[in-house]
Amino acid sequence: MSLLASPFAQLDLIRQPEQQNEPLQAFDAADEYLLNHLAEQQPASDTRVLVLNDSFGALAASLLGKVQVSSSGDSYLGALALEKNLVRNGLPFDAVRVVPASEPLAGPFDRVLIRVPKTLALLEEQLIRLQGQLAPGAQVVAAAMVKHLPRAAGDLLERYIGPVQASLAVKKARLLIATPQDKQPVVSPYPTRYRLEQPAIELLNHANVFCREGLDIGTRAFLPHLPQNLGSARVADLGCGNGVLAIASALDNPQAHYTLVDESFMAVQSARENWQAVLGEREAQMRAGDGLAGQAAQSLEVVLCNPPFHQQQVVGDFLAWRMFQQAREALVVGGALYIVGNRHLGYHSKLARLFRGVEQVAATPKFVILKARK
């Protein structure tokens, strides 16, 4: 049980995805610091509060019923955690206005509470989108654990919002308190674009997309070894990012049917725009989601995956293991999961625990491409 006690509420919170014997809490001292800081201001019930990047719903759930709260972030799992934690604590699950980071904000807001994200490009995009959304007398407060708080975060707040005052550290957390000033309107530098030589396509990347400035080296190693001659197979790109694996595969397999899934709303938005730019009106299913959770059993012949190795600042293979399990459930008997991974992660032995046969398709000094058949 993970109990968060704040001046606003006492809540029993869980992380997403749920794990048995979860060692980590669904909140940290930075969440507590933000809530205590807001409570000191004694906000009225009609105060309009925007929460950005609420990891597992701790902030929005605490504020529900005390102020008018909206929540926006780029994580489907974060939005799912908020919903489940509201229900878990007997609160109406639809009472918080949730806006994916891929959609525009609708202010004005009197207070903005920000958890500084791992990707500062996302923070920059969010601060730019606050232009014209702040009420007179508004305050913008960002928080992070000190070890995860780069100086550049304060620089971005100063550039796009106004003067910044850093708080004292409390329980190894710190606040950056920004006072809004009139600023010249800024055009966002996002999305960014880069070109590939093979296949010869241009890819668009919204602010929070992994490796938005250029193709990551794992995918670069994977692309020449994507499965061929798929016919009318049903194919999923699991953790699709900007959609490059599915798009490259679709170009070589014109009859195959594709589903693209990612837990980042901005990744799915990027994948959708890239698919349309390269493949026009060709049909594909795209969704933000918890991997292949909800995918019908035995509904896919092929799964392509470049699995992530971190969730926010937490590093580990638990997300990859979950994806492998989901792929096994979704594949037909005889279907195959294709992955790329760092050699040192030992994915071969992990896959062998779930699949009938695992073979190495190709390898580089750093990566292996594996095929696991159900």
Swiss-Prot record:
Leading EC class: transferase
Cellular compartment(s): Cytoplasm
UniProt similarity note: Belongs to the methyltransferase superfamily. RlmG family.
One example GO MF annotation: nucleic acid binding
Function of the molecule: Specifically methylates the guanine in position 1835 (m2G1835) of 23S rRNA.
SUPFAM superfamilies recorded: S-adenosyl-L-methionine-dependent methyltransferases
The entry's keywords: Cytoplasm, Methyltransferase, rRNA processing, S-adenosyl-L-methionine, Transferase
Superkingdom of origin: Bacteria
GO cellular component entries: cytoplasm
Organism per entry: Pseudomonas fluorescens (strain ATCC BAA-477 / NRRL B-23932 / Pf-5)
EC number(s) given by UniProt: 2.1.1.174
Catalytic activities: guanosine(1835) in 23S rRNA + S-adenosyl-L-methionine = N(2)-methylguanosine(1835) in 23S rRNA + S-adenosyl-L-homocysteine + H(+)
Pfam families named among the record's database cross-references: MTS
Protein's name according to its UniProt entry: Ribosomal RNA large subunit methyltransferase G
